[in-house]
A protein has these predicted regions:
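Conserved Rossmann-fold NAD(P)-dependent oxidoreductase catalytic core, especially the SDR/UDP-sugar
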Residues: 1-30
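Glycine/proline-rich active-site loop of Rossmann-fold NAD(P)-dependent oxidoreductases
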Residues: 36, 49-51, 62-72, 98, ...
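Mid/C-terminal beta-alpha module of Rossmann-like enzyme folds, strongest
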Residues: 106-172, 204, 208-211, 222
Length: 222
């Protein structure tokens, strides 16, 4: 059984390079809590001998169809409603969806993977302003809009209250703002050593495929 967790399990306050032995930390809201609870449940099942499990913690998965990192940002940028906290200097750890799926498949099949936790992310990181810059280029807009984390949190909190009153979902929640201001990245040496996995898709090629998908689905206007 493969449990799809997330790098958010490490919490948003940790800094530097984190491997799978780094303590988890519930400081990112309900999303983080659900990931930690599910990890606890499957590890308990493994310890009890009920089932063999593997936990994978994906990085910031992007590519065609990605709601949080392709679709939602494009929609917000088109409406001039997108801003980056930490002046765009937060760390983004992009992993293309095909590389992620390949890593999950290897984790499910490898005989030495049972009971293990694997980070499936890129090697290193990039600034959030560099990740989102192509989105602006695709739409023919200048940006990204870079603000302090404090200001971004204020705006996000207000937007969330308005969205709740109207029965809508605010995808740029305070938790998302905090996530985009983090200063951590993730070691993938364990996945390389045990699974023989590492990312193959270059960022430029991954974004080009994402752009084509976005254009084909009417997200880039006429």
């Amino acid at each position: 059984f493969v449990q799809i967790s997330s790098i958010v399990a490490y919490g948003n306050s940790a800094e530097g390079e984190l491997d799978e032995d780094h303590p988890v930390h519930a400081d990112g809201g309900s999303y983080v809590l659900t990931k930690l609870a599910s990890e606890h449940a499957v590890l308990a099942a493994q310890a009890n001998g009920d089932i063999e499990v593997v936990i994978v913690r994906p990085g910031d998965a992007y590519g065609p169809g990605s709601r949080p990192w392709i679709i939602a940002p494009l929609e917000a940028i088109a409406k001039n409603q997108f801003m980056l906290p930490a002046k765009g200097e937060g760390f983004f750890r992009p992993i293309y969806i095909d590389d992620l799926v390949r890593g999950i498949a290897l984790a499910a099949q490898h005989p030495d993977a049972a009971g293990e936790i694997f980070n499936l992310s890129c090697e290193g990181y990039m600034a959030t302003k560099d990740y989102f810059a192509p989105h602006y280029e695709w739409l023919g807009k200048k940006g990204p809009m870079l603000v302090s984390t404090k200001l971004a949190l204020r705006v996000s909190a207000i937007a969330s209250k308005v969205a709740n009153l109207m029965g809508n979902l605010n995808e740029a929640s305070p938790a998302t703002v905090v996530q985009l201001a983090t200063k951590s990245w993730f070691s993938i040496k364990k996945a390389e050593r045990i699974l023989g996995w590492k990312p193959e898709m270059s960022f430029d090629e991954g974004m080009e495929r994402s752009k084509q998908w976005a254009a084909d689905n009417g997200l880039l206007g006429k």
